[in-house]
Amino acid sequence: MLDVCLLGTAGMMPLPNRWLTALSLKYNGSNILIDCGEGTQIAMKEAGINFKPIDILCITHFHADHISGLPGLLLTMGNAERTEPLTIIGPKGLTRVVTALRTIAPELPFEIKCIELNEQDEYFEMNGYHIHAFRVKHAVLCYGYSVEIKRSGRFSVERANEKEIPMRLWNPLQKGNTVEFEGRVYTPDMVLGPARKGIKVTYCTDSRPLEHIVEAAEGSDLFICEGMYAEKEKIVKAKQYKHMTFYEAADMAKRAGVKELWLTHFSPSLVRADDYMPQVRDIFANAYLGKDAKSVELMFDED
């Protein structure tokens, strides 16, 4: 099970009932935070999300509405006597930016490990998460993120017995570990069937539409994508400032074959956003407006 909570849905500036951009993903006692805009701490408190289990922070880019909440969050983590290291992933220049933001939090009781992104696509495996960072098209260097929880095949007791594998080795093999025991090497494929469908969430904000985004989001259970503008005539502004309209996001969701789309990162000028959703659903039926604290528990398919 993967817990998803959209903490903030505002672009550019926070508004009443609309904090700046942030997304929380929780799995197996670990927490990923994607972006950390102003108000993220309040949004986390309101959603009942603990600061301590945050192991990984993914930053899309260095515009203030995506990172302005970071110094305060680091201070809160330090005041909570956190000692476990924090990994921060972000575009090239991340170390410099984090160092600058830490001016007000120079001494922390935990290590910060910065991973700078340089390539078009980069992949990481941490704490059970498979993270794909993919470059998008904004005014500055910017990345989207797909986070996947993979699922191994079913364990076959029959195959384990046929191969005379000691029962004490079944558990580590079922978890995907290779085991050496009494001079023999046992591998997971000896007892596991084909990999089963996992859970996938893709998050993309601050970009023009790209085929690269469609490819990264393909097959996602949930696609969270910016919809900066809802008014169709604002396509000119969207192109000028490298953002998207509701309809462009819906078109990408359709082409990517995702199960569900949440729109987010709304312009401060956007009001009565619900009025535009019928037209959006004409393009992609399973599209919804993101709202602060909107959450879902994504489950593995039963098979």
UniProtKB/Swiss-Prot annotation:
Domain of life: Bacteria
Cofactor: Zn(2+)
Binding site residues for Zn(2+) 1: 61, 63, 138, 206
Keyword match tRNA-binding: no
Residues annotated as binding Zn(2+) 2: 65-66, 206, 265
Stored Pfam families: Lactamase_B, Lactamase_B_2
Catalysed reaction, written as an equation: Endonucleolytic cleavage of RNA, removing extra 3' nucleotides from tRNA precursor, generating 3' termini of tRNAs. A 3'-hydroxy group is left at the tRNA terminus and a 5'-phosphoryl group is left at the trailer molecule
Keyword NADP belongs to the record: no
Catalytic residues (UniProt): 65 (proton acceptor)
GO function terms (MF aspect): 3'-tRNA processing endoribonuclease activity; zinc ion binding
Cysteine pairings via disulfide bonds: none
Cofactor binding description: Binds 2 Zn(2+) ions.
Record family assignment: Belongs to the RNase Z family.
Name of the protein described by the UniProt record: Ribonuclease Z
Organism: Agathobacter rectalis (strain ATCC 33656 / DSM 3377 / JCM 17463 / KCTC 5835 / VPI 0990) (Eubacterium rectale)
Lineage of source species: Bacteria, Bacillati, Bacillota, Clostridia, Lachnospirales
